[in-house]
Every structure is written in structure tokens, then in C-alpha cells.
Amino acid sequence: MLFNLIAAHDTSHGGFFNLFHYLTFRSGCACLTALVISLALGNPFIAQLKRIQREGQPIRTVGPERHILEKAGTPTMGGMLILIALFSATLLWADLTNGFVWAVMLTTAAFGAVGFADDYLKLSKRNTTGVSKRTRLGCEFLASLIAGIWLQSLTPPELRNMVAFPFVKDVLLPLGYAFPIFAMITITGFGNAVNFTDGLDGLAIVPVVIAALVFALISYLVGNHVFADYLQLHPVPGTGELAVFCAALIGAGLGFLWFNAPPAAVFMGDTGSLSLGGALGAVAVATKHELVLCIVGGVFVAETLSVVIQIFWFKRTGRRVFLMAPLHHHFEKKGWQEPKIVIRFWIVSIVLGLCGLATLKLR
């Protein structure tokens, strides 16, 4: 909004206001703005959640036993705090005439709405069921399909139906009319992947922040013809503004971590996990780096695969591959302490983030 106001009234492009024309400046400001908002609103927001929810998030009785004792009474829906900070900072610092910004923001909001409904039903019914799986997936597929078609329409015709591969520069897989389906699977898949990962204090938010940091850089490079040509990337004009969105996500995520660090004062809930995963998926689709997200978000992929493998193998043989799924619960059952699991997953996320960055140069 500030960029649009200044662009409309300052035609000289000189002095202090010229800074607003730099993506790096606005991205930094968006990150700091989101961080300040989340830190400032955190305590009163959590206090309000405690007053409304009273008993906090329902805890699964089939999960690790200590969760019932240690996590009972902790409020959920903390994802609303992330979204307030994220959207406020993005609306303030991004170019609001950019279609990619609106497509990603509305996708994030749609997934957040599905998560909010799920959290609300869990709290009102005092169980861990929430929205039925069929209804939830149907809403997610619809939102992500619309997002895929929208993002496809904003992409240059020569890349519109293409999927790029990491580590190779000239290989593009044409999907034709199937591309929106691919985008739908990517966005919905990562929405639920982050949801699976969000099972321990601080476990999901740091990998999200790391992925957002990587994709802030990718968005900036892909949206700039000079850098894209130098790195032999496929340029997508307009995606540079998503660096502002990703930077705001970093700030909002770090602010939330302040309150979600062990022992957590608040959980993000499905409101947060679904929306953040959907946001990452949408940015990856917009920048044509869907497969790179599978590397950067490898922790999310591993958590999801552990659930899929567990269900498939149990239905086939009646036995379990893991002591419990998702994967982080397997390590809990093995006797690992929660901080050790969380920090080791963070370390893995950092390494995977560096591997994702390496794909930009190793081509």
C-alpha cells in the first residue's frame, strides 16, 4: 500500500522515497513489521484465546502419553496471530497491483479458513475430529485448483504449463491442461504436510521460516530478468513481489516462535499449519520451483511419507513400519526428548534449505 501511494505521488524517483522502489528494502521492512506486530499482539492475543477456549486444544488420547499431561490446557488457533501479522505487513509493503501477491494471499487465507473451521469444531465438540476428511480435502482441492488456474494465467505463455527440474537448466516437462491438477496437488499436499509436522512445540514453524527465506530469494531472482538469465533460471515477471510476502512470513513466523518455543504458550493449530503450507505451495507454483520445495521442505515430505507408508503397510500386513506416525512421534516413542527431536529437525531443515539454494547455481 505504501509503495502504491508513493508511486502515485512521487514521480521524481529521488531522495528517501526512492527506497520504496527497491524490493530488498520493502522486504526487510515487511519482515520487521510482521515481527513487531506478532510480538506486540502475542501476549494479549494468547490471553484472549485462553479466556475463550478455557480448556485449550483437545489432545489425542492415542498419542504419546506425556502430551496429555504436558500440553493439556494450551490454547490453539495461534495461526491467526501469524496471519494477522503476515497480511498486515504484506498489504503495507507489497505492490497491491501485482496479481501474484493477491493469488498467494487469498490462497493462504482460504487454507486458513479451512483450518479455522477445523479448529473451531474441535474446540466446540471437545474432540480431535473437527471437519470431516472428505469435506476438508474437498475445500482444499477447490481452493488450490482455483489458485493453480489463477497463477497459471499470470505466467508467461511459454512457461504456463511447464514444470522445471532442479539441477538442470533446459529441461521442462509440459503438462498441458494437467498443470492446474499438478498445482492443486502441490498446494494441498504441502498444506497438509505442514499440518502433519505440527505436533511438537516449535517443530513446524522453523522449517516454514527456513523455506520462506529460501523462497524469498528464489522469488527475487526469478522475478528479475538479469539475475534469472545469469543463473539460467526461467524468469517469471512479477514474482519478485512475492519476496515481500515471504519476508513478511519470516517475520510473522519468528514472532510466533517467541511464544511457541518449548514449552509452548500457544499452538498454531490447523489455522496456522494449513495456511502456511498452502502459502509455501502457492509461492512454489508461482515461481516454477515446485520440485525445489520438495527439497527445501524435505522435513514436511518425510513426515507425510511416514503417515502414508504407515497406513499403507498396516492395511496390507496388519503391522506398523514406525512405532507411531507422523515421524516425530516415532522418535518420541523411542525415548527421544522433545527438545532433541525439534532441534534435530531444525538442523535437517537448515541443511535442506542450503541444498535448495544450491539448485540455483548447480545447473
From Swiss-Prot:
Official protein name in the record: Phospho-N-acetylmuramoyl-pentapeptide-transferase
NCBIfam families on file: mraY (TIGR00445)
Predominant localisation class: membrane
Pfam families documented for this protein: Glycos_transf_4
Known pathway: Cell wall biogenesis; peptidoglycan biosynthesis
Keyword Electron transport: no
Summary of the function given for this chain in its UniProt record: Catalyzes the initial step of the lipid cycle reactions in the biosynthesis of the cell wall peptidoglycan: transfers peptidoglycan precursor phospho-MurNAc-pentapeptide from UDP-MurNAc-pentapeptide onto the lipid carrier undecaprenyl phosphate, yielding undecaprenyl-pyrophosphoryl-MurNAc-pentapeptide, known as lipid I.
InterPro entries, A to Z: Glycosyl_transferase_4 (IPR000715), PNAcMuramoyl-5peptid_Trfase (IPR003524), PNAcMuramoyl-5peptid_Trfase_CS (IPR018480)
Keywords, in A-Z order: Cell cycle, Cell division, Cell inner membrane, Cell membrane, Cell shape, Cell wall biogenesis/degradation, Magnesium, Membrane, Metal-binding, Peptidoglycan synthesis, Transferase, Transmembrane, Transmembrane helix
The keyword ATP-binding belongs to this UniProt entry's keyword annotation: no
Entry GO terms, CC: plasma membrane
One of the record's GO molecular function terms: UDP-N-acetylmuramoyl-L-alanyl-D-glutamyl-meso-2,6-diaminopimelyl-D-alanyl-D-alanine:undecaprenyl-phosphate transferase activity
CC cofactor: Mg(2+)
Membrane topology, record value: Multi-pass membrane protein
Coiled-coil ranges per UniProt: none
